[in-house]
Amino acid sequence: MKQMTRFSQMACLALFVLFPLTVSAQTITLTLSDQNSEMSWGPVHATQPWVKQVEKATNGKVKIQIYPSETLAKGKQNWMAAKDGICDMSWNVMSYYPGLTPYADVVVLPGLPFRTGEKGSEVIWKLFEKFPEVSDQFAENKVLVLYTSEPFILMTSKKQVKTLEDLRGLKIRTVGGPPIEQMKALGGQPMLLPMPDVYVAMEKGTVDGLEAAYEPIPGFRLNEVVKYITEGPFAPSLFAVVMNKKKWNSLPKDIQNAIMSVSGLEGSKFFGRNFFDAARVPIKKMIEEGKYDIKIYTLPETERARWVEVGCKPIWEQWVKSMEGKGHKKAREILNAALEMGK
């Protein structure tokens, strides 16, 4: 009897030891809400490869299930979807949430020194790490990646814009924050629209054009409604991949470290480089080969200088004064840091 009792005790002890190993070895599946089509450039060249990097870094212990094309949450709802646990992770256009992260808007000021998404992404992540005032405004969710597009281009359907005078009065889809003020200063009428709604708005003439990067042109079939592109001193846009805090805190520390090993600064630069910078080459090639019926015009330096004086530098000062007026006393210091980091 004693032998049986000892055997039972040993068996129970073995189960007690082995059971946690079995549980920890189970795959953790995380959901990621995305507004973009799974076939569009950014997801194919950045989001999906990053997901694979996470899976590799965690030795397969983490799997991420992407829900594309707003199938889990609408684009404008993605921040709250992550916060409320509707999804574990979400891809966010930060301009959809005016006033949520005002310090971070510094990187969407027009005319900053950086000219690529990769450099802009480096700037915003370093600001996020350096200034608690920046990171605290993202505190509702766990931030995995912060990245920017390259400075926007202006796309129009019926009128080619070559001068400030050409832009005046045009209804232009833009994003929230400083780009709205720039468009007003340049004489355009800013319109806030989610990217999935732009095609129909352009087709119906609800808007005359839009500010965006090159990347969404094929994914949102903008080549069918855009006839002209103007390259000038426009602002970029800011994006974030975030995670529900409770879910993040539930992950083992080694899993957290593995995820951040492919996120953070290097992950942000990866997204900026692959989501946006790399997209320009094939799209411009399609235009050059006549596969897209679009004309590209780059502002000459003299005209560009006019735009900078009218629609860039005054916006910087306006942003600082507005921020300081709302109690955000670090605005000028953060702007100066962004200008220095962006060189």
Predicted regions and their residues:
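Bacterial N-terminal signal peptides that target proteins for export
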Residues: 1-12
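Bacterial N-terminal signal peptides
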Residues: 10-22
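N-terminal secretory/targeting leader peptides
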Residues: 26-121, 133-343
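Intrinsic disorder/low-complexity segments
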Residues: 4-5, 21, 154
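Intrinsically disordered, low-complexity, polar/charged regulatory segments
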Residues: 128-129
